[in-house]
Amino acid sequence: MSRYTGPSWKRSRRLGISLSGTGKELARRNYAPGQHGPNSRGRLSEYGQQLHEKQKLRWMYGLNERQFRTLFIRAGKIREGQHGINFMILLERRLDSIVYRLGLATTREQARQLVNHGHITVDGKRVDIPSYEVSVGQTIGLKDKSKNLQQIRDALEATTARPSFVSFDENKMEGTLVRLPERDEMEPEIDESLVVEWYNKLL
């Protein structure tokens, strides 16, 4: 399944949340796009709620359906913890997500582009795979030439706080995943139990 390349604001308005995390998509029109947008969010069925939550989480992290489902299945094989929370932890451990959490990018989409274009290093070695799974203790940095990119400097300047599961050295412009995230440190708008219910019916 190909990745959606249309305007992200349309998806954000349809779901009623900011998928980029900036809030800009909903600043002017906090309702779904289209002629009936202001009145289009009625009460969803149980099926609709589960699908809505699954799509919201998938689009938030920018994965296609195959990638998303594969990661969900992997999370189910982890013996300790809850399936839904383990799934979200795996999403957070993606390299593009850690780059975003460190403040090197203002959105996950921008973080994914930085990884794809070869600007990001893991333990000093260039990694250009956004889905690369970061382990606790690994250091995420920038190639020397990339440290002067204006978009990265702008992102760092705009970053006012970082979650406690990462640390960042402003001078070296690199950060570390110091531990796995807790549930309250991940996306609060998501009800992961609905995502689990959705896939349990399909798998």
UniProtKB/Swiss-Prot annotation:
Q: Does the keyword rRNA-binding apply?
A: yes
State the similarity comment.
Belongs to the universal ribosomal protein uS4 family.
Q: List the NCBIfam families hit by this protein, alphabetically.
A: PRK05327.1, rpsD_bact
- Encoding gene per record: rpsD
Q: Which HAMAP family match?
A: Ribosomal_uS4_B
Which chain positions lie within coiled-coil regions?
A: none
Show the GO MF annotations: rRNA binding; structural constituent of ribosome
Q: What does this protein do?
A: One of the primary rRNA binding proteins, it binds directly to 16S rRNA where it nucleates assembly of the body of the 30S subunit. With S5 and S12 plays an important role in translational accuracy.
Q: Which GO terms describe its biological process?
A: ribosomal small subunit biogenesis; translation
Q: What is this protein called?
A: Small ribosomal subunit protein uS4
What's a single GO CC term here?
small ribosomal subunit
What's the superkingdom here?
A: Bacteria
| Matching Gene3D superfamilies | Ribosomal Protein S4 Delta 41, Chain A, domain 1 (1.10.1050.10), RNA-binding S4 domain (3.10.290.10)
Which UniProt keywords are listed?
Ribonucleoprotein, Ribosomal protein, RNA-binding, rRNA-binding
InterPro entries, per the entry: Ribosomal_uS4, Ribosomal_uS4_bac-type, Ribosomal_uS4_CS, Ribosomal_uS4_N, S4_RNA-bd, S4_RNA-bd_sf
Q: Which Pfam families match?
A: Ribosomal_S4, S4
Indicate the segments forming the S4 RNA-binding domain, all copies. 93-155
The entry describes its oligomerization and partners as: Part of the 30S ribosomal subunit. Contacts protein S5. The interaction surface between S4 and S5 is involved in control of translational fidelity.
Q: Which PANTHER family match?
A: 30S 40S RIBOSOMAL PROTEIN (PTHR11831), SMALL RIBOSOMAL SUBUNIT PROTEIN US4M (PTHR11831:SF4)
